[in-house]
Amino acid sequence: MINIGLSGATGKMGKTIIEIIDQFKDCQISEKFNSTNNLNDLDNLCKNSDVIIDFSTPEVLEKLINYALKHNTKLVIGTTGLKKQHFKLLEKAAKTLPILYSANMSIGANLLNYLAKESTKILDDYDVEILEMHHRNKKDAPSGTALMLASTIAGIKELNITFNRGNRIKSKKEIGISSLRGGNVHGIHEIFFLDNDEIITLKHEALNKNSFAVGAIKSAIWLQDKPSALYSMQDIYKV
């Protein structure tokens, strides 16, 4: 039985994971951490868990990494809004621990990322823009998924990523991201490939949080026999 510690247990993703965990017979929630806990409670979270699924905040993640290293606890990180310093911490810790990070753990979003990569190779001279939409209470913008998609495309076309372009005219050497917030939208991401004669659109829409939660739990199971490294969902789905 795999003991999964859940960081961010009272958030939307944490609640969804708790709701569906019984679908997986080879794992259980061993310990929970949420915003009412003291950060030092992360010590017990890591001590009593084989792997942590983290959907918390960047501030919590920094402490979590330290305790995970102390107890040799594997990490599945789905927290978004991370900065360069957080990724440096993950890369350093991954020399000692198996860690999986993804801004979106659903198979659909990762398939979209693959399709974006392959489409970009074919539509080399097209302009590219990304539109993402989420519920009114989402704290970060643009979304981590939008940044993942933009990074994939920008890496192929050698483009700069722009958010909130304002009054400036679009440069040929950039990919723009636009964000909408409202209602109870779980997540919509659209990629537009545009030229003078046609527009090609790739789209993924999450109907609820279940696909993200399933991906996170599958990641925790997959990580059990893996050596120390920083992994992504592409390593699981082979896309």
Swiss-Prot record:
GO molecular function: any one? NADP binding
Query: Which keywords fit this entry according to its UniProt record?
Result: Amino-acid biosynthesis, Cytoplasm, Diaminopimelate biosynthesis, Lysine biosynthesis, NAD, NADP, Oxidoreductase
Pathway-wise, it operates in: Amino-acid biosynthesis; L-lysine biosynthesis via DAP pathway; (S)-tetrahydrodipicolinate from L-aspartate: step 4/4
Positions binding (S)-2,3,4,5-tetrahydrodipicolinate in this chain are H135, G144, T145
* Enzyme class at the top of the EC tree: oxidoreductase
Q: List the disulfide bonds.
A: none
- Kindly list the positions annotated as binding NAD(+): G8, A9, T10, G11, K12, M13, E31, G78, T79, T80, S102, A103, N104, M105
Which InterPro entries does UniProt cross-reference here?
DapB_C, DapB_N, DapB_N_CS, DHDPR_bac, NAD(P)-bd_dom_sf
Chain positions recorded as NADP(+) binding sites: K32
Q: Please list the reactions this protein catalyses.
A: (S)-2,3,4,5-tetrahydrodipicolinate + NAD(+) + H2O = (2S,4S)-4-hydroxy-2,3,4,5-tetrahydrodipicolinate + NADH + H(+); (S)-2,3,4,5-tetrahydrodipicolinate + NADP(+) + H2O = (2S,4S)-4-hydroxy-2,3,4,5-tetrahydrodipicolinate + NADPH + H(+)
Name a biological process GO annotation.
lysine biosynthetic process via diaminopimelate
Record family assignment: Belongs to the DapB family.
Query: What job does this protein perform?
Result: Catalyzes the conversion of 4-hydroxy-tetrahydrodipicolinate (HTPA) to tetrahydrodipicolinate.
Q: What is this protein called?
A: 4-hydroxy-tetrahydrodipicolinate reductase
The scientific name of the source species is: Rickettsia typhi (strain ATCC VR-144 / Wilmington)
Q: What is the lineage of its organism?
A: Bacteria, Pseudomonadati, Pseudomonadota, Alphaproteobacteria, Rickettsiales
Gene behind this protein: dapB
